[in-house]
Amino acid sequence: MRTLLLTLVVVTIVCLDLGNSLICYVSEYGAKMTCPEGKTLCEKYAVPLMQGHFYFAWRCTSTCKAGAYNICCSTDLCNKIP
């Protein structure tokens, strides 16, 4: 009985810890990052350069930018690299 209780406590602690560890892409080369506390979304967004041209940026965020080419999501590695 004590072993079962100890097992349940350990599993609960591990699950609570994993619940706050969203992983997002953070570069065009596929670099990944575990997001810090408070950053609950992954984002891929377009940064305008000059008329008709832009590049993409990736990040962990708490709020996403609006835009036709932007992706905002909340699961691991959901802001895919093209």
UniProtKB/Swiss-Prot annotation:
The keyword Signal applies. It comes from the Eukaryota. It is found in: Secreted. Disulfide bonds join 24-42, 35-60, 64-72, 73-78. GO terms for molecular function: toxin activity. Expressed by the venom gland. The keyword Secreted applies. Keywords: Disulfide bond, Secreted, Signal, Toxin. Residues 1-21 form the signal peptide. GO terms for cellular component: extracellular region. Its main location: secreted. Belongs to the three-finger toxin family. Short-chain subfamily. This is Three-finger toxin MALT0063C. It comes from Micrurus altirostris (Uruguayan coral snake).
